């Protein structure tokens, strides 16, 4: 199997083989994109575990997406807010390079194209700005809710609880 085919299948698996779970499956789907984030600090594509896209109506036609990754050798996952247009275009470019696509992969590409077109047709200066989602979520106990969580126990940490 060609490495690009394996890469595309990885993306398909990252979306759980079904389109529906990839859409709006996160508690806070509308998030601010950190445009000042150093690109070199982004994870390897092979560290990405989940990719989440939103329906256009979810965030009032602001195209934000999220992906979850676990750095190699770490035991916590982190959620990153991303430009939905960029992430959709990247995945579509990878899917277009796969020669023998499974049926689900073709459906995934078709649905991403439909959603991306819907966003593009409703694109305005107002909905191109994600900073309005810059809200700090507070839990019932009054503490700030974070997006980092333990995904497996570490032999060194003992309890498996996050530090702090």
From Swiss-Prot:
Record-given protein name: Envelope glycoprotein L
Function: The heterodimer glycoprotein H-glycoprotein L is required for the fusion of viral and plasma membranes leading to virus entry into the host cell. Acts as a functional inhibitor of gH and maintains gH in an inhibited form. Upon binding to host integrins, gL dissociates from gH leading to activation of the viral fusion glycoproteins gB and gH.
Cellular compartment(s): Virion membrane; Host cell membrane; Host Golgi apparatus, Host trans-Golgi network
Assembly description: Interacts with glycoprotein H (gH); this interaction is necessary for the correct processing and cell surface expression of gH. The heterodimer gH/gL seems to interact with gB trimers during fusion.
Principal location listed in the UniProt entry: virion
Family of the protein in this entry: Belongs to the herpesviridae glycoprotein L family.
Keywords: Fusion of virus membrane with host cell membrane, Fusion of virus membrane with host membrane, Glycoprotein, Host cell membrane, Host Golgi apparatus, Host membrane, Membrane, Signal, Viral envelope protein, Viral penetration into host cytoplasm, Virion, Virus entry into host cell
GO BP term (any one): symbiont entry into host cell
Organism: Equine herpesvirus 2 (strain 86/87) (EHV-2)
């Amino acid at each position: 199997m060609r490495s690009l085919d394996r890469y595309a299948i990885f993306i398909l698996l990252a979306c759980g083989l079904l389109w529906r779970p990839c859409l709006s499956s996160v508690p806070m789907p509308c998030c601010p994109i950190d445009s000042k984030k150093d690109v070199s600090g982004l994870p390897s594509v092979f560290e990405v575990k989940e990719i989440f896209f939103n329906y256009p109506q979810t965030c009032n036609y602001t195209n934000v997406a999220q992906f979850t990754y676990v750095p190699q050798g770490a035991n916590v996952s982190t959620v990153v807010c991303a430009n939905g247009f960029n992430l959709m275009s990247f995945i579509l470019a990878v899917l277009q390079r796969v020669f023998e696509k499974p049926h689900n992969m073709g459906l995934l590409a078709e649905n991403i194209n439909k959603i991306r077109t819907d966003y593009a047709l409703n694109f305005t200066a107002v909905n191109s700005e994600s900073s309005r989602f810059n809200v700090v979520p507070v839990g019932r106990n009054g503490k700030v809710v974070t997006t980092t969580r333990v995904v497996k126990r570490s032999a060194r940490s003992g309890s498996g609880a996050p530090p702090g």
